[in-house]
From Swiss-Prot:
Tissue expression as described in the entry: Highly expressed in brain, particularly in the substantia nigra. Also expressed in the corpus callosum, heart, skeletal muscle, ovary, testis, colon and spleen. Weak expression in pancreas, kidney and lung. Expressed predominantly in the cell bodies and axons of primary sensory neurons, sympathetic neurons and motoneurons.
Keywords associated with the record: Cytoplasm, Cytoskeleton, Phosphoprotein, Repeat
Sequence repeats: 20-30, 31-41, 42-56, 57-67
BP GO annotations: adult locomotory behavior; chemical synaptic transmission; protein secretion; regulation of dopamine secretion; regulation of neurotransmitter secretion; synapse organization
Subunit structure: May be a centrosome-associated protein. Interacts with MYOC; affects its secretion and its aggregation.
Name of the molecule in the record: Gamma-synuclein
Biased composition (Basic and acidic residues): 107-123
Subcellular compartments: Cytoplasm, Perinuclear region; Cytoplasm, Cytoskeleton, Microtubule organizing center, Centrosome; Cytoplasm, Cytoskeleton, Spindle
Start and end residues of each stretch annotated as Disordered: 91-123
Mutant lacking the gene: phenotype: Simultaneous knockout of SNCA, SNCB and SNCG exhibit an age-dependent decrease in SNARE-complex assembly. Thus, synucleins are required for maintaining normal SNARE-complex assembly during aging in mice.
Amino acid sequence: MDVFKKGFSIAKEGVVGAVEKTKQGVTEAAEKTKEGVMYVGTKTKENVVQSVTSVAEKTKEQANAVSEAVVSSVNTVANKTVEEAENIVVTTGVVRKEDLEPPAQDQEAKEQEENEEAKSGED
């Protein structure tokens, strides 16, 4: 009987030791898993913030490009409208063409402004 008791006692100690090792291993694995999950979560959060910032910046750039195009288009339409209105009043005889011609200094300023608008439209 003593042999059995001693054998079972040794086996019991082995099982208890294995359980302790298993418990320790599971605890360590859980801690490492938690670290890994937290790391992934942190990196994902950083990447999401970076992505949102990047998208916001690109959206701002596109909005600026669109607004510049709209302003340029509106200026072109306004200039064409004025030109056509001048043509109509001259054709109908309401005003003489000479009366519509701006003084030479105003004409130079207008040409310079149109050149600047053309340059800004190219950017």
